[in-house]
């Protein structure tokens, strides 16, 4: 994605007042940028529940896990977040008014497929709804 396309997407996301729509757009953009660098991300946690309930449950952040065992080098994360004007350290940032957390490798033995959802800035992968709900119960 070109710097111009990223800047345009960022401007659109920042001007989006609906928090669910903003989170979906930002998730798509982040997923696309990491995919360009070879890292497949999956939306997990409260943000997965938020997307499934169409905002009926609001988590306040976007949680990602990676699908591969290969760790994402910190420099790659920093470069991508810097392109988005994000602020933060290690694996947690404030980007376009939303907190984004990179939690590590996706740990699941589920055979259920992830749900794919198209956004204006890329396709996001979301853990199955059953896993999202179980996860919320376990961590509540």
Task: Cite the ranges covered by each PLM segment.
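Compositionally biased terminal segments of proteins
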Residues: 1-140
